[in-house]
Curated annotation (Swiss-Prot):
The keyword Membrane applies. It is a multi-pass membrane protein. Its main location: membrane. Interacts with STIM1; stimulated by depletion of intracellular calcium. Interacts with ORAI1. Interacts with the plasma membrane calcium-transporting ATPases ATP2B1 and ATP2B4. Interacts with ATP1A1, ATP2A2, KPNB1 and XPO1. Belongs to the TMEM20 family. Pfam families: EamA. Residues 83-205, 236-360 form the EamA domain. GO terms for biological process: calcium ion export across plasma membrane; regulation of cytosolic calcium ion concentration. The chain crosses the membrane at residues 72-92, 100-120, 134-154, 161-181, 190-210, 225-245, 256-276, 289-309, 316-336, 340-360. This is Solute carrier family 35 member G1. Keywords: Cell membrane, Endoplasmic reticulum, Membrane, Repeat, Transmembrane, Transmembrane helix. It is found in: Cell membrane; Endoplasmic reticulum membrane.
Length: 368
C-alpha cells in the first residue's frame, strides 16, 4: 500500500489483480475494491481532469453507454501515484529523531481518521463478511509489518536502494502464488526471479563477492545491510499480502481492507515501540507536518494506483510504475546530494526488467 502500504506493494497489488469490475486492489498490493468517488451515484458524465473534456468516459455512467476513458488518464494516475508514494518516502527519510515504527503508528492514526467516515458512508461495517475475517486479519498483520520494515529501510539505507529492492515484490508474489494458490510457475518466472536476485546482490554488494569496497555508501556497511534486509523483508511480506488479497477475491470492500491494515498496524507498532523503548515526541514544526502528510500521501497513492488499473492495461501500468525508482533516484540526488552508485543503477535495471517482465507476462496469460 510508500510506502505500503508502500508503493511497491500497492503497485504490484493493483497490477496483479486488475479485473473489469475490480473491487479489490494489491503496492504492492490484487484484491481490494476500487474507489471511484466521482462515479459513485453519478448517472451522467462529468468533466474530466486533466483533459477537460465533458464527453470523456472516465466518469461513471450506465454501462451500456459507457465509452473509453480519457486517453492516457490511467497512466497519469500511475505517475501521480508513484510521485505521492515517493514524496511520502522522502518525508520518512527527512523526519528526525522518530523511529520507523513510530512513523508507522502515526500513519495508521492519520489513515484511520480518514477511513472511519468512508466506512460509515459506504455502510460496509467494520468487521467484514464471514469466511473472510481470518484473511482480513492476516492481511492487516502482514501488510502493517511490511510497512514498518519499509520505513526502517528508508531510515537506514538510501532511498534508491530501498525502493529498488522493494520493487522486487511481484517476483516473490509469483513464488507464493505457486505455493499457496497452485498457480503455474514457469521457467520464465524462475528466470525473472533469478534476475531480480542478481539485482539485489548488486545493491547489497556482499563482501565475499565484492570484497571490502564500500565506496559510494553514505551509511556504514552494517546499517546498509540492516536496511537491505528490511527492504527484502518488506518485499516478502508484501507478496504474502498480495496472495491473501487474491485469495479473498472481490468480496471485500477496498476501505475495509485498509481498515484492517491500520487497526491492526497501530497496536502492533505501539507494542513494538514499548518493547524496544524507542517512543519519542516528534519535534515541533516540519517533523509533525511530515508525519501527517506521510499518512495522507500514502492513502492518496493507494487510491490513484487503484483507479489507474481500472482504466488502463495492466502491462502499461507495470511499466509506468518504474517511475517509483526514477523519483527515488531524483529525490536522493536533489535532497540528500547522494548520487546512486553504478552498482545501484545496475541492480535497479535487473529488478525493473524482472518485475516488469513477470507482470506483463502474467497479464498476457490472463488476457488469452
Amino acid at each position: 500500500m510508500g510506502p505500503p502500504e508502500s508503493a511497491a506493494e500497492l503497485a504490484a497489488e493493483a497490477v496483479e489483480l486488475r479485473e473489469p469490475e475490480l473491487q479489490l486492489a494489491d503496492p504492492a498490493s490484487p484484491g481490494e475494491e476500487h474507489v471511484d468517488v466521482e462515479a459513485e451515484g453519478a448517472p451522467g458524465r462529468g468533466r474530466c481532469w486533466p483533459c477537460g473534456a465533458w464527453a470523456c468516459g472516465s466518469r461513471g455512467e450506465p454501462e451500456a453507454k459507457k465509452k473509453a476513458p480519457c486517453p492516457g488518464l490511467g497512466l497519469f494516475y500511475t505517475v501521480l501515484s508513484a510521485f505521492l508514494f515517493s514524496v511520502a518516502s522522502l518525508f520518512v527519510k527527512k523526519v528526525q529523531g522518530v523511529h520507523a515504527v513510530e512513523i508507522s503508528a502515526f500513519r495508521c492514526v492519520v489513515q484511520m481518521l480518514v477511513i472511519i467516515p468512508c466506512l460509515i458512508y459506504r455502510k460496509t461495517g467494520f468487521i467484514g463478511p464471514k469466511g473472510q475475517r481470518l484473511f482480513l486479519f492476516l492481511r492487516g498483520v502482514f501488510g502493517s509489518s511490511a510497512m514498518i520494515l519499509m520505513y526502517y529501510a528508508f531510515q537506514t539505507t538510501s532511498l534508491a536502494d530501498a525502493t529498488v529492492i522493494a520493487f522486487s515484490c511481484p517476483v516473490f508474489t509469483s513464488i507464493f502464488a505457486w505455493i499457496f494458490l497452485k498457480e503455474k510457475y514457469s521457467l520464465w518466472d524462475a528466470f525473472f526471479t533469478l534476475f531480480a536476485i542478481a539485482g539485489v546482490i548488486l545493491i547489497v554488494r556482499p563482501p565475499f563477492i565484492f570484497g571490502s569496497d564500500t565506496s559510494g555508501m553514505r551509511e556504514s556497511y552494517s546499517e546498509h545491510i540492516k536496511g537491505t534486509f528490511a527492504a527484502i523483508g518488506h518485499a516478502v511480506l508484501a507478496a504474502i499480502t498480495l496472495v491473501i488479497l487474491r485469495k479473498m477475491g472481490k468480496s471485500v470492500d477496498y476501505f475495509l481492507s485498509i481498515w484492517y491494515y491500520v487497526i491492526l498496524g497501530l497496536p502492533e507498532a505501539i507494542i513494538i515501540l514499548f518493547v524496544i523503548g524507542e517512543w519519542s515526541l516528534p519535534y515541533c514544526g516540519l517533523d509533525r507536518l511530515f508525519l501527517i502528510l506521510i499518512g495522507l500521501l500514502g492513502l492518496g497513492g493507494q487510491i490513484f494506483i487503484t483507479k489507474a488499473v481500472q482504466i488502463e492495461k495492466a502491462g502499461l501500468v507495470a511499466i509506468m510504475k518504474t517511475m517509483d525508482i526514477v523519483f527515488a533516484f531524483i529525490f536522493q540526488i536533489a535532497f540528500f546530494d547522494n548520487v546512486p552508485t553504478w552498482w545501484t543503477v545496475g541492480g535497479a535495471l535487473c529488478v525493473v526488467v524482472s518485475t516488469t517482465g513477470a507482470t506483463i507476462r502474467r497479464w498476457l496469460q490472463g488476457s488469452k
